[in-house]
């Protein structure tokens, strides 16, 4: 029996020694890798490359797909507004033009364009309608915020 115990003890000692050697070799390689200037440079490059990806949603309000959809909506609303005004449906025309104004990235430039292209009385009526549409939009936003806050 002593030879079996000796064999098991020797085997356990060799396994423990092998584990220590393997672990120390891994620590040594990691130490060498971290001291390598090329590794540090690659690590910094990865961090820099990963950083804008994390901050991109904060800088960009909409993703490109939604932005394209908004542009299509904008052009459709302008066209519908023009058609309604040509047909004499001023109420619907103003509504479409104000919707286009609300989603436009540069509303001042669009207002200047409307001022040049629309008759003065139509442009003035459009200006009068804008605060009402903005107020309706704010009320809609407030009501949706209350719905989001409700736990039900």
From Swiss-Prot:
Residues 1-6 are mitochondrial intermembrane. InterPro entries: MAS20 (IPR002056), MAS20_rcpt_metazoan (IPR022422), Tom20_dom_sf (IPR023392). Belongs to the Tom20 family. Residues 28-152 are cytoplasmic. GO terms for biological process: intracellular protein transport; protein targeting. It is found in: Mitochondrion outer membrane. It comes from the Eukaryota. The chain crosses the membrane at residues 7-27. One of its GO terms (cellular component) is mitochondrial outer membrane translocase complex. Keywords: Membrane, Mitochondrion, Mitochondrion outer membrane, Transmembrane, Transmembrane helix. This is TOMM20-like protein 1. The keyword Nucleotide-binding does not apply. Its main location: mitochondrion. The keyword Transmembrane helix applies. It comes from Mus musculus. It is a single-pass membrane protein.
